[in-house]
Amino acid sequence: MEEAGETMEVAPAPVLVRLPPHLVVLFPGADRLVSVQATSVAEMVDGLDALWPGMRERICDETPAIRRHINVFVAGRRARLTTPLAPGADVFVITAISGG
């Protein structure tokens, strides 16, 4: 039973992450579809970086925030590092494409 003022900690649960081909090719052995344990987008990035060191630097800048040319979507909505993830969430990481 929770006491007044106490918060219950949520245990990380599996979320499904879909990575773009432009990012996956930089990490030999990386999959486009991966399951990681996370309760937020920041924890998801940590999980990806644990699997493939250097992934965090490709997704996030030094502030830290998601890089300008990377978009993360959860349930069809653009997400930030602080966005919470429900168990079984489907997360899409998308790179911006530009050209002239």
How does the language model describe each region?
Residues 1-99:
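Ubiquitin-like/PB1-type beta-grasp interaction modules and other compact soluble beta-rich domains
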